[in-house]
Amino acid sequence: MLPRPAHLTADNAARFKDQSVVEVYPLRLPYPPEVFDILAGLITDEPRAVLDVGAGTGDIARGLVRRVERVDAVDFSAAMIAKGRTLPVGDHPHLRWIHGAVETVALDAPYALITAGESMHWMDWEVVFPRFGDALTPGGVVAIVHRAELPAPWQDGLEVLIRQLSTMQNYQPFDLIDVLEKRDLF
């Protein structure tokens, strides 16, 4: 089994609670609009309910809420949730923000779709995947979503900058899906 990357610690995850991180979070590249068509198309069961884990400011939750019956957006950062509520569609009546760690919060299952937008790497995989299995409808799907990669020259430069400027000096890029598959978690 592949080891968990060394930079994925609780201390590093806690940085997402910092107000300075929260304020710049909406400046990240947006998900292409097609992502929401694809995600909505994965839903084949009723209820058309979505659980968005590690939701942050709700980029996925806000993009899906008009296409489904409801979205429960879970994040452990109250500051991220507060920011998400102020963004477009963040106050939609079918979008329920839940503050807490997905490993322990009460869930309103079943869900036909569980999404994790660039957040799964921070979670306790041995805890969340069994929870997801219990929370999904019979034909439900877990979708781990990443933003489009930058073209190779930019991506290489970005990796250099991350290593130089990040306070996470032990950061190492890794393939999350490969690690999860080798752990046989789903």
Regions found by a protein language model. Give the residues of each.
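A short beta-strand submotif of the Rossmann-like class I SAM-dependent methyltransferase core
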Residues: 116-117, 125
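A short, conserved alpha-helix within the catalytic core of class I
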Residues: 123-132
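Conserved acidic residues
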Residues: 48, 69, 112
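Conserved class I S-adenosyl-L-methionine
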Residues: 1-45
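Short conserved AdoMet
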Residues: 44-45, 65-69, 89, 124, ...
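A short acidic, Gly/Pro-enriched loop at the edge of an enzyme's catalytic core
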Residues: 106-114
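Conserved catalytic/acceptor-binding region of the Class I
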Residues: 133, 137-186
